[in-house]
Amino acid sequence: MPRKISVVAAVIERAGSYLICQRPLEKRHGGLWEFPGGKLRDGESLEDAASRELAEELGIKVQTVGKPLLSLQDPGSNFVITFCSVEAVGEPTAKEHLDARWVEAGELLDFALAPSDQRFAHTLMND
């Protein structure tokens, strides 16, 4: 059985809106929207991975990473995605994504979200 690959997804909320990013076309789930983040390196914590990925991909600085909100097995892959509440400063710039947007909670499901992100958005809406 393939080794599980841990992924952190940053749930960044500002003034009632959440940051979502559109995945590059050449990647898995290309063109779909996601909560930003990425794979953990060997021995890396969720906090360190979130800080590194958000700086690399969006040019924003993480202040705090909260405890995990939800962990999901990504359908059809060996990725396990852990969604964490993150506070970050700076205005995001899509460096690796096609686009980055602030979206109100009630509008999240209007976007074509990647499967695990869609499942998380449903959870978020029901809380």
PLM regions and their residue ranges:
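Conserved hydrophobic "DFG−1" position in protein kinase catalytic cores
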Residues: I12-E13, I20, V86, W102
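Conserved N-terminal beta-strand and adjoining loop/helix that marks the start
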Residues: M1-L19, K39, L70
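Conserved Nudix-box catalytic region and its N-terminal flanking loop in Nudix hydrolases
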Residues: R14-E56
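HhH-family (HhH-GPD) DNA N-glycosylase catalytic core used in base-excision repair
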Residues: S51, A55, I60-V65, D127
